[in-house]
Design a protein with these regions (language model features):
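Short connector loops at helix/strand junctions that flank enzyme active sites
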Residues: 15-17, 23, 34-36, 41, ...
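Active-site beta-strand termini and strand-to-loop segments that position acidic
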Residues: 22-25, 99-101
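Class I (Rossmann-like) S-adenosyl-L-methionine-dependent methyltransferase catalytic domain
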Residues: 5-10, 77-84, 91, 134, ...
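Acidic, metal-coordinating catalytic segment for phosphate/diphosphate chemistry
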Residues: 1-19
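Conserved Nudix-box catalytic region and its N-terminal flanking loop in Nudix hydrolases
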Residues: 23-62
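Unchanged
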Residues: 46-70, 78-133
Length: 144
């Protein structure tokens, strides 16, 4: 079982991931990985010595090809349970952000095959027990 929780803040050193919910012209932005037939929002691991908001910007640019965007932190989230990126099941923390993308690169240079703009949320999620809850929390907060 996977549990997702939300926090206003935690100690910075606990933040290991950044996940970015994105929209462009009123549509949801999702990535399709080259090795999967599912969709996900952009995100990834924090590099050593990296500011967590810089992690979010880097992952957004790498995975979506975003060139022009505005990004804002929403909250801290945690995931407890074994997942594709956590084989121990211990609670891990990340920064959840929102980005409005106004310009994309013509080509992607990452593990992502393509970026898709959707009116509705996808049915085939890469992380179905996590990412829908992150988006639901963003929508409930009505911040952006």
């Amino acid at each position: 079982m996977v549990e997702v929780k939300f926090y206003d803040t935690v100690n910075d050193e606990l933040l290991k991931f950044a996940v970015i919910i994105s929209q462009s012209n009123g549509k949801w932005v999702f990535c399709k990985h080259k090795e999967r037939d599912t969709y996900e929002v952009s995100g990834g691991h924090r590099e050593a010595g990296e500011d967590i908001l810089e992690t979010a910007k880097r992952e957004l640019q790498e995975e979506t090809g975003a060139i022009k965007f505005e990004i804002k932190p929403i909250c801290v989230y945690s995931v407890t349970g074994k997942t594709r990126v956590n084989d121990t099941g211990e609670e891990t923390f990340g920064l959840l952000c929102f980005a409005e993308i106004t310009e994309f690169a013509k080509e992607l240079h990452s593990e992502m095959e393509k970026v898709v703009l959707m009116d509705e949320l996808p049915e085939n999620w890469t992380y179905p027990l996590i990412q829908p809850k992150l988006i639901e929390n963003k929508e409930n907060l009505k911040l952006y």
